[in-house]
Amino acid sequence: MLTLKLISEETERVIKGLEKKHFEGAREAVEKVLEYDKIRREAQQKLDSNKQQQNQLAKQIGSLMKEGKKEEAENIKTTVADLKAADKALQEIMDKAQADMTHVLLDIPNIPNKDVPEGKDASSNVVIKEDLTNMPQLGDEALCHWDLLKKYNLVDFDLGVKITGAGFPVYIGKMARFQRALEAFFLDEARKSGYLEIQPPYVVNEASGLGTGQLPDKEGQMYHANLDNLFLIPTAEVPVTNIFRDEILDEKDLPIKRCAYSACFRREAGSYGKDVRGLNRLHQCDKVEIVRIDTPEHSYQSWHEMLDHVEGLLKKLELPYHLLLLCGGDMSFTSSICVDFETYSAAQHRWLEVSSVSNFESYQANRLHCRYRHSEDKKIELCHTLNGSALALPRIVATILENNQTPQGIRVPKVLVPYCGFEYLDDKND
């Protein structure tokens, strides 16, 4: 959530930032916030004035009673009663203005960092780095991953439909072990980089969804347990970041680095055409998330370190990849800046997103009331929050399957062999 201070002091910059993000009605939304704030402040001033007047009148009543001027004192008591009645009305005005202002603020996205390119959609994203060292050269008979999964009996999509519905695959034999190997590898690499592992709940309350910005923006894409008003998590970012909701951290303890594996659940409402085939787009997937909490001065250093971490994983998995700096119109609701990592899927002849690494600056922290205390002057300030996928499994698996297919089976990247205990993914389960 944008701070009221930022909106009040840098109104035009905020409006231009929202327009860069292609947020419709940017000026109107900002003007609503300022109008509700004006109503709230005016009511507060009147309330403060009333309180001051009541204190003065209370002293007069005391003096008059001592002097025996009871009738005059009673008249003043009537005035005090009227002021107290006015106080109640003013408090109601303040509360309503605050609620209305918060409602509008929750629907306003974050503004982009100055380095974010202009653009409305993915066509304006900018490739800022690429490594094609491991680009495979496959023949015309190369199979897409969904055909490979069927050939080697590694995933049963029909069984998932029987048990739950489309988008909930069942992993079998070596593929189940391969999934577990990837999760362990990603977590171990995060631990080596200084991240403390968390095993979070997969279900969160409404306050947690609001805190990280999935609510109200992404409510339609989340699975909602209506009876208990709980939500299945779309990413471990939600429970892990909410650990620090309503906390005041010490500057000396920053940056805070956490990682977590979780299953992730997304309704993914809408039609995506070819994107839905195989593992390209699922309702349930597995992912390791890295989260950092830092000071405003150091958050971009943290962000670059997170980019380096994700890039290191892709190198170790021997995959071709590139980094996309997202344009304003293609960024998430909460991001200030975001880089997507995509790997090349050789049989599909397309790039697949496998990670997003974002700096939210103070946007999430303002919703979360996540703050830190300066070591020297003890001043309390909003933290910056960051997160990234390190990595998301389904599309990583898809690219490994397609890029590493051989007549003997799917060659397992060398770094994963110690984790899964075999060198090829095939139908020979031992």
Where are these regions (language model features)?
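N-terminal alpha-helical targeting/anchoring segments
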Residues: M1-N134, L154, D158
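TRNA-recognition modules of translation machinery and tRNA-sensing kinases, especially anticodon-binding
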Residues: R27, E130-D430
